Amino acid sequence: MAKKSLIAKNKRPAKFSTQAYTRCERCGRPHSVYRKFKLCRVCFRELAHKGQIPGVTKASW
């Protein structure tokens, strides 16, 4: 889990657009965040396996 202070800091609007960065909406992780879902890869995988993200299926070929 991310520090509460960093999560609160991220919710404030950035002074400049280049300072803005993505964080996971669920756990606050700053790295490996999918913009479309606003989730990190770890949370995305957990929710996808549970079937809580509509339209997402595990690839098999």
Curated annotation (Swiss-Prot):
Function summary: Binds 16S rRNA, required for the assembly of 30S particles and may also be responsible for determining the conformation of the 16S rRNA at the A site.
GO molecular function: rRNA binding; structural constituent of ribosome; zinc ion binding
Organism: Streptococcus thermophilus (strain ATCC BAA-250 / LMG 18311)
Regions crossing the membrane: none
Entry note: cofactor: Binds 1 zinc ion per subunit.
Cofactor: Zn(2+)
Keywords: Metal-binding, Ribonucleoprotein, Ribosomal protein, RNA-binding, rRNA-binding, Zinc
InterPro entries registered for this protein in UniProt: Ribosomal_uS14 (IPR001209), Ribosomal_uS14_bact (IPR023053), Ribosomal_uS14_CS (IPR018271), Ribosomal_uS14_sf (IPR043140)
UniProt-annotated binding residues for Zn(2+): 24, 27, 40, 43
Protein name per the record: Small ribosomal subunit protein uS14
Family under the similarity heading: Belongs to the universal ribosomal protein uS14 family. Zinc-binding uS14 subfamily.
PROSITE patterns documented for this protein: RIBOSOMAL_S14
Domain of life: Bacteria
Subunit organization: Part of the 30S ribosomal subunit. Contacts proteins S3 and S10.
The keyword Nucleus is annotated on this UniProt entry: no
Record NCBIfam families: PRK08061.1
UniProt GO BP: translation
HAMAP family in the record: Ribosomal_uS14_2_B
Gene Ontology CC annotations of this record: small ribosomal subunit
